Amino acid sequence: MSEQASRSDGRVFLVVVDESPEMRNALRYACRRAKRTGGRVAMLYVMDPPEAQQWGAVVDLMRQEARQQAEEVIARYADVAVSLTGQPPAIHIREGKSRDELAKLITEDRSISVLVLASASSSEGPGPLVTAFAGKLGNQLRVPLTIVPGALSEAEIDAIS
């Protein structure tokens, strides 16, 4: 596909936002690819559901606090996306299990073109989402999966994106 054709497609690069160090690599890569191809970045933050409690008020308070934290985290990284792409990202905040909510979002939002994840640079493995979607759940994706090595420097990411 030519560069011009990809620009008209409005490619959307989805990044799952969390507090892991490698997530920054996925975000940087997605932003640079979006800018170079005339696309956009979308960000997904998945809140853990509150554990079952007897009192609904406690669950409601836990949800409010989790939502506030999600909004703060995603706002911080949305600012990074704006600085790298010049445009605000699409923002999705959901509650549930990360891999389930990620799969649902990709199914529901037909504008998403590429899923960008970063592998953890620790010896514990690449991370749960990379493990899931590069493995058994990969056949459920309707979009390509790009895995950015978590150990890359910003300069190395810039060179490949």
What do these predicted regions represent?
Residues 1-5, 82-115, 155-161:
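Structural beta-alpha unit
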Residues 3-57, 140:
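Small/aliphatic-rich secondary-structure junction motif
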Residues 11, 112-114, 142:
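Conserved acidic residues
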Residues 26, 53-56, 103-104, 127-128, ...:
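Short, well-ordered secondary-structure micro-motifs
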Residues 42-44, 90-94, 146-148:
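General small-molecule cofactor/ligand-binding pocket signal
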Residues 116-140, 152-157:
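Glycine-rich, Arg-bearing micro-motifs that act as flexible, cationic patches
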